[in-house]
Amino acid sequence: MRSALTAIALLALAGAAFASPAQTPPTPEAAATLVIYNHTDPQSQALAKYYAGRRGIPADHLLGIDCSSKEEISRDEFLVDIRSPIRNAFTAHGWWRVETGEDGQHYVRSASIRFVAVMRGVPLKIQSSTRDTALEAHADIQPGTPMALIAGQNEACVDSEIAAMFSLIPETAGFIPNPYFQQSVPALTLPPAHTPLLVCRLDGPSDAIVRHMIDAAIATEKTGLWGWAYLDERSILSPGYVVGDEWLTSAGSAMRRQGIPVIADYASEVLPPGFPMTDAAVYYGWYTQDVAGPFALPGFKFLPGAVAVHIHSYSARTVRDPNAAWAGPLLARGAAATMGNVYEPYLELTVHLDILQDRLMNGLTLAEAAYTATPGLSWMNVVLGDPLYRPYQSWSALTPTTGVHPNIWQRYRQIVLDANGDPLQAIPELTKLAIDAKTSMPLEALGQAQAAAGQFDTALQTLRDAAKVEHSRLIRFRLALERIEILRRAGRKDDAVEAIKEDLGTFDSDEEQTTLGRIALAINPPPPPTPSPIPSHTP
C-alpha cells in the first residue's frame, strides 16, 4: 500500500438456518434500488431476479446491459457498453431529472434511484488508458508532483465510476471528492447532489456464494449479527501508515462501547494460521497481498452475515478466485460483505473502517455506511454485499420475543450498555455471567478491554480467570495466545518467552506447537548470521 499524505490535499480540492427465499416486503430503499446485470450472461440475470425477489425490488428496476463478462475492460468498453446504457435508462425511465443551471452546467436535481446492485457477470475494473482529455479536470495541478500522479490515474473500479454518475462529469482521471463522505444520515433524506449513487456489487467466486451473501444478509437482519469482532493491527509507527491502525483502534473502541466483544492483535505480522477465530462476526485487519493466517486454513468459516475487510492495495484485484487477494476469499469463507481495491488506491483513499463500523452500528445500510466511509469516487474502491443490508437492524428490538432467551452475546451487550458502554465498569456482572453461563466469553472480552486501556496486569489475571471457566481446549489455547501478546505489548519479552515455554508443555498438538513456535520466533528472532571476513590478500 503506497501512502500519499498529499492525497489529503487533493481531497481539499474537492450455522444459522436461512428462511426459504420468499419475497421480503418492499422498503423505501428497495423501491429506490436498481439491479444491473449482464444481459449476455444467463446466470447474471438469474442472480438479478433472485436478489430483486428477495428484497421486493420492482421488476422494472432490473436493467440488463450487453457487456463483456471479463473482470477487466478498457475505458472505451466501459463508456460504450456500461455507462451509456445506464445513463440512457435513467433518462428513458425518468429515474432522474437533469436541469441546466445558470452557469450552463447540467445538474441532477432529483432521482428516484439511489441504490444500485451490480450483479456477478458485470466487469469489475477499467484498465488504465492514455487519454489526454482525462486530465482536464485537474489542469490546476502542477505536473510532476505527487498530486499530479494521483490526478493522472484513470484506471478505476466500474462500480466507483457508476457511483459518480450523478456528477455528470464527462470523464475524469484521479478521483472525485465524495459529497457523502463522513455524513451520518440516510441517503434518502438528502438530495442527489449530496450523495453518489450508492453502488454495491453482488459478486464472488461462484453463484452459490452470491446467493449466500443475499440470504445471509436478510436472515441476519432478523436474528442479529452476534459474535466476536477481530482486529488485526500492525503497531506501525510510520507517519504515512499509522492511520490504518488508528482506524482499527477507533473501530474497536466504538464496538466495545456498543457491547460488541472485541479481540485485538497488535503484532506486526498477520494473525498466525493456528489462531482460533471462533464465532467471527466482524474482521478488520491488514496487511498481506493474499489471504493468509486463519482464513487460509481448510474449513474456516465466518458467521452468517459477517462483515470482513482486509486493507491491501489490491485486495479486490479479482473477486472470482476463492484463494487470491482478499475479497473473494473472505466471501468464499462465509462473509456477507467486504470492501476492497481493484488497483492501488493510496491508503488515505481507502475505506475508513472506523466510520464504516460506526455507521453500520447506527443503522445505515451497507451501501450508505460504505460510502460515508469512502473519500473519493471514480477511484479504485469496491463494496461487495447487499447494498440494503443492515447487520445491526435487530438492535432496535432489544427485548426478546416472549419465550425466547437472549443469547450470551445479547446478555453481554446489555450488561455493557447498562454500564454506560464501559466493560471496565461491569466487572462483577461480567464475572457472574461467565460463571452462570459456564463460558469464558464475558471475561475474555473484559480482559481484552482492560488490555486496550493499558491495564496489562489486570488483563492477564482476567484472562487466567477466563481459562478456569472455559471447557473448550481451543478457546483455552486462544486465551494463552492472548496472554502472550499482552506480555509482549507490555514490554515483558522475557516473560512472554517463558509463557510460551510453559504453554508448549500444555498445548502439545502439532498445530498448537507450530503456532507457539512461530510466535516465539516473532518475539525473539535469532540473530542474523555473522558475515564471513573478507580473505586477506597474500602477495
Where are these regions (language model features)?
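Structured catalytic cores of large enzymes
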Residues: E71-T249, A254, W379-Y392
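C-terminal soluble interaction/assembly domains
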Residues: F300-A373
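Caspase-like cysteine protease fold
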Residues: N362-G421
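Generic helix N-cap/helix-start motif at coil->alpha-helix transitions
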Residues: V404-R411, A437-E444, R473-L481, D510-T515
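Structural register within alpha-helical repeat arrays
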Residues: R413-Q414, L446, R483, A520
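Structural motif corresponding to the intra-repeat A-B loop/turn of tetratricopeptide repeats
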Residues: N420-G421, A453, A490, I523
